[in-house]
Design a protein with these regions (language model features):
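Intrinsically disordered, low-complexity, mixed-charge
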Residues: 1-101
Length: 101
């Protein structure tokens, strides 16, 4: 008998403020790779935008994604002026969390 699949969500967040040139993307990747519970991993990516914003997409269980985004918001609060969230389609087979250029 196969195990039931856990629910998976994907959230995109566009951050504005002083979010480029301050280690924002590296901190997001570090949180995803080391702070989040390895039994409930986060996948996705983070990248700089031409207008000075940073876009992040995070995928995983609802609890993992919300915990990850909370950690990002707390650790980088001094840099974030606004964060606009949107639900996205789940990317099947995605592995890892990376920095896109």
């Amino acid at each position: 008998m196969s195990m039931p699949r856990r629910p998976v969500i994907r959230i995109q967040v566009r951050y504005s403020g002083r979010v480029q040139g301050v280690g924002f993307r590296a901190t997001c990747a570090w949180i995803a790779q080391t702070v989040v519970d390895s039994a409930d991993p986060i996948t996705g990516w983070v990248r700089n935008e031409a207008d000075g914003d940073v876009t992040l997409e995070a995928q995983g269980s609802p609890a993992a994604v919300e915990g990850f985004l909370k950690e990002v918001g707390e650790r980088l609060a001094r840099n974030i002026v606004s964060a606009v969230r949107a639900g996205m389609a789940v990317v099947e087979g995605e592995r890892g969390f990376g920095i896109r250029r």
